Amino acid sequence: MSSKYPRSVRRCLPLCALTLEAALILLFYFFTHYDASLEDQKGLVASYQVGQDLTVMAALGLGFLTSNFRRHSWSSVAFNLFMLALGVQWAILLDGFLSQFPPGKVVITLFSIRLATMSAMSVLISAGAVLGKVNLAQLVVMVLVEVTALGTLRMVISNIFNTDYHMNLRHFYVFAAYFGLTVAWCLPKPLPKGTEDNDQRATIPSLSAMLGALFLWMFWPSVNSALLRSPIQRKNAMFNTYYALAVSVVTAISGSSLAHPQRKISMTYVHSAVLAGGVAVGTSCHLIPSPWLAMVLGLVAGLISIGGAKCLPVCCNRVLGIHHISVMHSIFSLLGLLGEITYIVLLVLHTVWNGNGMIGFQVLLSIGELSLAIVIALTSGLLTGLLLNLKIWKAPHVAKYFDDQVFWKFPHLAVGF
């Protein structure tokens, strides 16, 4: 059986990808160099371990989390790794160019790699809404546009609102979710009759998705604390994230059983809701003064995630035609907004406790940053969706959505692989 992947794309994609990689190599040759400062060995090892945690989360966690479609698990894992590798390279260059004026040599440090990895992770989150409906060439365009849009957002927030690295990246959950949902909304929506089977989850891919959720669950404190400079803030961020995640697990399993008429547990609900606490405390994890607050936030986040996973597909998939919206929307966008609201409330309380009279100004700044992030996400997502609809990319036909056979060579073709 011959591949249904358009022949023109199969022929030009390797050449285009290698040409893009060669261009990146030249940019690294002319515009980058390693940090020559002497850093103590203990600090170097600790910094590398945080970067390693982020890479595990991105490559294994987010890669396997999106592999729950029965006939699209290979592409989900491999395409995520491809996007991560490309996104990190482009993010390092872009962050270096945007952070200095006039432009000069980009200094590569372990911290800049951490920052680039988190920027690339936003693409992997967004791609969860479109994987199975686009080819690799379209994903390359999506990586370049989204990393550029997120870098621009960070630069604008940093210059206008004068925030540090952690604060100007705290919106990346919301940004990634709404960017991905906007791109998915622009793509061809209906699945033809007879192809709905490709959109179904199976037991083995669901176990793979749960494995990805476990990787994310174990290493999520590293994401929430990766860009914090103060040791006290890093400690608070890690502790509060662990407490919130622990409560999310209990809430996910209990809530999943409660949501089923026969009190059975749904793997789909569980592998999304166990991560709810980590997303919800991501923005404010360093400000939470007591573990019980993080635990309450994890409980509320778990319930919202279960409710979103149960209710949103019924109304949103039919109205918007966006597949996989349950995980994307109930985890990252809804809980990202919950985290933003929590941050504003804690900021107000912190300002009152310290006797600062600038409460209204601080709230206005926070709302302005969030609004700017959503506007840029929707605008750049719409632009990306329109670009991906161009015929030059030879997008997969809707009859071949969520089908690994379009992209991969199999040693044998068997029904239900």
UniProtKB/Swiss-Prot annotation:
Restricted to tissues or cell lines expressing erythroid characters. Isoform 4g and isoform RhPI-Alpha are expressed in immature erythroblasts but not in mature erythroblasts. Pfam families: Ammonium_transp. It comes from the Eukaryota. Changing L60I: Found in antigen C/Rh2. SUPFAM superfamilies: Ammonium transporter. Changing M238V: Found in antigen RhEFM. The chain crosses the membrane at residues 12-32, 44-64, 77-97, 125-145, 172-192, 203-223, 238-258, 265-285, 287-307, 331-351, 358-378. The keyword Transmembrane applies. Changing N68S: Found in antigen C/Rh2. Changing Q233E: Found in antigen RhEFM. This is Blood group Rh(CE) polypeptide. The lineage of its organism: Eukaryota, Metazoa, Chordata, Craniata, Vertebrata. The gene is RHCE.
